[in-house]
C-alpha cells in the first residue's frame, strides 16, 4: 500500500518578503505557492485519483497507529465536584430535535409565578423568618447629607460627616433638630 502513496515535490518558498506584516496564508498572497489560494485548489483537482488512494492509505495508517497506542494511556474522565451528574437541562430536545431552545425565566417572571401559587397563612416567607441581629455594627449616616457619619453632635445628637455640616447643625432651630431626629426615629433629648 505504501508504494501507491504519491510523492509531492516540496513547493518553493513564497516570493513575498518575510518582513511583510501579512501572513503568507492571507488572501492577498494568492499568487504564492504557500497560501490558501487558487494554487491549493489546483493541486486538489489535479490529483483526482491519486488523492482517493492517499486518503485510503492515510486512514489505514491511522488505524494501525491507533491499534498500537490503545493501551492504558487514556485516563478516565474524573467528574467535577461542583457539577451535578444527574442534571438535565430543561429544554427537552433542543435544537437537534428542531425545537426552539427554552429560555430561562427572569426574576420578574419567577416572582409573578410565586405570587400566583396558593400560599397558606402559616407558610414561611421572607418576612416571617426571624433572624438574630447582625454581629456587624450598623453603619451611621449623616442626618443632613446622608453620607457616612463618623461624628455626633453632643448637644443636638444629630450625626454629621464634615465641618460644614457641623456648623450648619449648630445654627438649626430646635424644631428642625427634632424633625431630623424623628426622621431617624431617635428620641429627642431636648424638651
Curated annotation (Swiss-Prot):
Q: Which UniProt keywords apply?
A: DNA damage, DNA recombination, DNA repair, Nucleus, Transcription, Transcription regulation
Task: Please give the Pfam families that the UniProt record associates with this protein.
Answer: YL1_C (PF08265)
Tell me where it resides: Nucleus
The Gene Ontology biological process annotation of the record reads: chromatin remodeling; DNA recombination; DNA repair; positive regulation of DNA repair; positive regulation of DNA-templated transcription; positive regulation of telomere maintenance in response to DNA damage; regulation of cell cycle; regulation of chromosome organization
Region (Disordered) location: 1-41
One GO CC annotation = Ino80 complex
User: Briefly, what is this protein's role?
Assistant: Proposed core component of the chromatin remodeling INO80 complex which is involved in transcriptional regulation, DNA replication and probably DNA repair.
Tell me, how does this one assemble? Component of the chromatin remodeling INO80 complex; specifically part of a complex module associated with the helicase ATP-binding and the helicase C-terminal domain of INO80. Component of some MLL1/MLL complex, at least composed of the core components KMT2A/MLL1, ASH2L, HCFC1/HCF1, WDR5 and RBBP5, as well as the facultative components BACC1, CHD8, E2F6, HSP70, INO80C, KANSL1, LAS1L, MAX, MCRS1, MGA, MYST1/MOF, PELP1, PHF20, PRP31, RING2, RUVB1/TIP49A, RUVB2/TIP49B, SENP3, TAF1, TAF4, TAF6, TAF7, TAF9 and TEX10.
- Can you name this protein? INO80 complex subunit C
Source organism of the structure: Rattus norvegicus
- Name of the gene encoding the protein in the UniProt record: Ino80c
Amino acid at each position: 500500500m505504501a508504494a501507491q502513496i504519491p510523492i509531492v515535490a516540496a513547493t518553493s518558498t513564497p516570493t513575498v518578503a518575510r518582513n511583510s506584516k501579512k501572513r503568507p496564508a492571507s488572501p492577498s498572497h494568492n499568487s504564492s505557492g504557500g497560501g490558501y489560494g487558487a494554487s491549493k485548489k489546483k493541486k486538489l483537482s489535479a490529483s483526482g485519483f491519486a488523492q482517493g488512494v492517499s486518503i485510503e492509505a492515510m486512514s489505514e495508517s491511522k488505524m494501525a497507529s491507533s491499534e498500537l497506542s490503545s493501551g492504558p494511556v487514556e485516563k478516565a474522565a474524573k467528574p467535577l465536584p461542583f457539577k451535578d451528574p444527574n442534571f438535565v437541562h430543561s429544554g427537552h430536545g433542543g435544537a437537534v430535535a428542531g425545537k426552539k431552545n427554552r429560555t430561562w425565566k427572569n426574576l420578574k417572571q419567577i416572582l409573578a409565578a410565586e405570587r400566583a401559587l396558593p400560599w397558606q397563612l402559616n407558610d414561611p416567607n421572607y418576612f416571617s423568618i426571624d433572624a438574630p441581629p447582625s454581629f456587624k455594627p450598623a453603619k451611621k449616616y449623616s442626618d443632613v447629607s446622608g453620607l457616612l457619619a463618623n461624628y455626633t453632635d453632643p448637644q443636638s445628637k444629630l450625626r454629621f460627616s464634615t465641618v460644614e455640616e457641623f456648623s450648619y447643625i449648630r445654627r438649626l432651630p430646635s424644631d428642625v433638630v427634632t424633625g431630623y431626629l424623628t426622621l431617624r426615629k431617635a428620641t429627642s433629648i431636648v424638651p
